[in-house]
Swiss-Prot record:
InterPro entries according to UniProt: RecX_HTH_1st, RecX_HTH_2nd, RecX_HTH_3rd, Regulatory_RecX, WH-like_DNA-bd_sf
Gene that this polypeptide is encoded by: recX
Name of the protein described by the UniProt record: Regulatory protein RecX
Any one GO BP annotation for this protein: regulation of DNA repair
NCBIfam families per UniProt: PRK14135.1
PANTHER family per the UniProt record, alphabetical: REGULATORY PROTEIN RECX FAMILY PROTEIN
Length: 264
């Protein structure tokens, strides 16, 4: 048996050094000090010292998680990953999670709701992308579904309109059909369904600028016609039309351009 001869506070808050029989023995957290009722004069055997060391290891891991949580909200999955990163014994993980839950320091339902609320107020992402992010964070489907109820049809329409207007400006130098395709693709990439675009398109699709469209077509047509010069007659026209269609131009407009040319 060894006897505690001194308990000394470390510079780090909540940590103490334990001295046995006049010699430094080991450090402990304040919670461990209380848990084992350690005080000057307490006698400890090897089994008790081992139990104290195990408890302190768990206390340090818990303290690390408190630091980790101090910067932002975390999911249970985040905590588990972090505990593994710092080589926390597997048997400590569930008890640490239970303690954090009990103190309401982790709550996946609240995390999901907060994340969705933040995205609605600060970003132009749709529910599809947000659902995927929350899944990657280890959030359960029920918690995700509850959080996404904030994405009412009205909220989706408002965000989608802002994003669509931004995308239409970005692709303003594209042919009308290609521009609209790009906007639809952009909305879907950001997590909005095709039905949302159908709901808002009458409000966001710009009025056609015929002069600009004609200029774009004429410029691109001249370039593509040169590119297919290795073909002759009908075959050249077919390759030309295919190239123009891939670029987003209407085939009737392409034919009109062809009809207006004098290739003699």
């Amino acid at each position: 048996m060894a006897k505690i001869s001194k308990i000394e506070a470390q510079k780090r808050k909540g940590r103490y050094n334990i001295y046995l029989d006049g010699k430094y023995a080991f450090p402990v957290a304040e919670s461990v000090l209380i848990q084992f009722r350690l005080m000057k004069g307490t006698e400890l055997d090897e089994k008790q010292i081992a139990a104290i060391a195990t408890a302190d290891q768990q206390a340090k891991a818990y303290s690390r998680m408190l630091d980790y949580l101090s910067y932002q909200m975390r999911t249970e999955s985040d905590i588990v990953k972090k505990l593994k990163e710092i080589d926390t014994p597997e048997e400590f993980v569930e008890s640490i999670l239970k303690k954090l839950r009990g103190q309401q320091l982790i709550d996946d339902h609240a995390y999901a709701a907060s994340y969705v609320r933040t995205m609605i107020n600060t970003d132009l992402k749709g529910p599809g992308v947000i659902r995927q992010h929350l899944r990657q964070k280890g959030i359960g489907e029920n918690d995700i579904d509850d959080a996404l109820t904030q994405f009412t049809p009205e909220v989706q329409a408002e965000l989608a309109k802002k994003l669509a207007e931004k995308l239409f400006r970005r692709y303003r130098n594209q042919p009308e059909r290609r521009r609209e395709q790009k906007v639809q693709q952009g909305l879907m990439t950001k997590g909005f369904s095709s039905s949302v675009y159908e709901m808002i398109k009458d409000e966001v699709v710009p009025q056609p600028d015929l002069e600009q469209e004609n200029d774009l077509l004429a410029k691109e047509a001249a370039k593509q016609w040169r590119r297919v010069r290795c073909y002759q007659g009908y075959e050249r026209e077919q390759h030309f039309k295919q190239a123009m269609y891939r670029k987003g131009f209407d085939l009737d407009d392409v034919q009109s351009w062809l009809d207006a040319q004098d290739f003699q």
